Amino acid sequence: MKYILIIMFAIGIMECKTKEEKGLVGDNWAEKLGFPKGSKVVILHADDIGMCSEANQAAEPYLLNDEIQSAAAMVPCPWFDEFAEWAINNPQEDIGLHLTLTSEWQTYRWGPVSDPKSVPGLIDPDGFLWHEVVGVVNHATAEEVEIEIRAQIERSIQLGYRPDHIDTHMGTLYSRADYAYVYFKAAMDYNIPAMAIEFTPEIVEKFRGQGYPITDEMIEFFNQYSLPKLDDFFSVPQGNTYEEKIAIFFQLIQSLNPGISEIIFHPSVETENLKGITNSWQQRVWEAKMFSDPAVIEFMQAEGI
């Protein structure tokens, strides 16, 4: 299902005054959006598309074959334009922007989309975006972050692709409350759904335990965001072998609570170039085949997902 359907639903209900009038009644967002009580709704979401050609090659057949539900592309990266053209030619697919403020690889780097002079705090001594989130947090103002994420959205629109949603690469936009504020502000200004999680006490505890600085101020910003949210969020687990990776993924699926859960992964086809970019290449190659694996498809169907 395209995120655009969710935003149309949300826009249609926002003028109503009460939760009952809005139809937003239920214990989780799956129920609020009309799924039967107790439903486990999973969004399989491909991240880091546009980062390299190998990522594009992996994501496109997944989407065309309806084996995954959505993907998000990195505007500053060299292969974004190619994927944007593909998205324009395949409007039925849910393609968003993976708003990117870091450039994490050792030798494969990129800089900002906006004028570097306007975002000096986002740029490391080598002239690229910072390797790690902490570099952004320690140097970039919220104003600089807002300039850059809006430049990325504008770049996509100028190429002819209006994204179906936006989310955040490496969680950077959740690393400071003022970053989260400009993220949601951009989402509302452009009328593009942002990936957001319903911050129940259990979810807050989970993400704080993972090292995310979820402050009360950030929770307030999330609560004020009026479009539909996720109930939980996961990454496809790593494994020492493909079989182990699949087995751990099955355990994750069986552990899900009712509601809408997004599970992200980073598919790429195997090449020597990919191996030179990232030492996580093997996990990415496995993730490029696991969701077309008949055993995985059968398992998901058996779980009612």
Name the predicted role of every residue range.
Residues 92-150:
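Substrate-binding cleft of extracellular glycoside hydrolase catalytic domains
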Residues 41-43, 68-72, 92-98, 163-167, ...:
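Structural preference for beta-strand elements that scaffold enzyme active sites
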Residues 142-227, 239-245, 254:
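Catalytic domains of cell-wall/extracellular-matrix polysaccharide-remodeling enzymes
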Residues 1-23:
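Bacterial Sec-dependent N-terminal signal peptides
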Residues 194-195, 277-305:
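C-terminal domain-boundary segment and adjacent tail
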Residues 16-43:
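N-terminal pre-catalytic segment of deacetylase/amide-hydrolase enzymes
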Residues 53-77:
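A short alpha/beta connector and helix-capping loop motif
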Residues 32-34, 59-65, 82-94, 111-124, ...:
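Acidic (Asp/Glu)-rich catalytic clusters
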